[in-house]
Amino acid sequence: MSGLILNILVIGDVGNVFKTISKYVKNSKIHIINFPKDGAGIYTYDENYELFENYKVSDQVKKINQIKENFDLAVVMGTGERIAYLADLNYVSYYVGRDIDAPRFIKNSKESWYNEPLHRLNFFERRFYKKTFDFAIAHIAPTWVFEHLKKFSGNNIKMDLKPIDLTLFNDNSELHLKKNEKFTFFCPQRMGIPKGTDILWKALQFCKSDFQILQVDWRDTGTDEENSTSLRLRENLPSQVKLIPMIKRKDIPGYYHSCDAVIGNLRIGSFEYVELEAIMCKKPVISFTDKKIKICVDGKEMESPFIPNTNDPKDIAEVIDNFVVSDQFRQNIFKKEYNFVQNISDPKKAGEWWDSLFEKMIKENSSINRKSSGITVKLRMLSFLISNRLYFRKIKNYSRSA
């Protein structure tokens, strides 16, 4: 397969992961089709995606069937998995969080920090989503997410490299905003329990130094519990917190450059893209590290330098104050963080890894088409429609047009 360009179809790109990877693979050409922009997606999506025209699953499957012959392999994220299953593709599933720590195929699945289930699906729906999971030819997840993936059997692969788009996040940006007069932390992630906003608010009660936090006015709104808890956080802002409007992805580097430091996730115990982007923009980061979460690159275990190693509010407050009052403290932490991120976010190395994976998967699966029988594929769609309690008329209309 040497010398050939592999054509990869990505269905659903959560967090612009594969948009970044597409810039650094050499032996593969990645085409992404994403779900319609709405809500926060208007700001967080890259602006150069092909989009499905609507959220109707049958239309999305029809679209994929029209273009699939142009590709060698599919990669899916989130609900892209069900589209690939219904289109009978050979696909690799990549997970980034609640798509596997609270999977749809588990009854009343919920994340550990919530009491309310994320999904309340009936038996037939759960069975359908278990089939979409099992149908994948490989499952891939990074860092803390892999700890959840490995609970389920399958061709599970741990991949901790998280490449950063260096064309956007670097120290040469011309998007520098006016420098703030007061020491300023930037917090671009959503307000909510999963990001540790509740922990941060408690920590701020113990802080003694003078600073401000620019928090993006963006919060969790999924379940009733998510919505109510994030709303309480928004309505009870500590005095140090100032809300700023949502920011488009292309404009975020300017905010990194104008702040003094960045506050990342304080709950999950592992870094996300916010932490890595900030470091590549040469800003020190505060983020909780759980030492029990293992990180491996090139077969070697690495230790995350992000601090603190506890998410006790008083310990976080102490780190915040040290960041504010001591330039030497910040620089010492930043040097360790920067050296680590240079390895964990090396886009060239990540591009090589994905090129190698794509080649391996395509050698083992000669076509993007799974080549199931026509009746089997049709029954999958009917099963999906029935499990979602759709009307008989919709089922009959699909049968006539299929």
Where are these regions (language model features)?
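Active-site proximal beta-strand in glycosyltransferases
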Residues: 86-118
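Membrane-proximal helix-turn-helix segments that form the acceptor-binding/catalytic region
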Residues: 110-139, 146
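Acidic anion/phosphate-binding donor-loop and adjacent secondary structure
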Residues: 163-182, 254
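Glycosyltransferase donor-sugar binding loop
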Residues: 212-230, 245
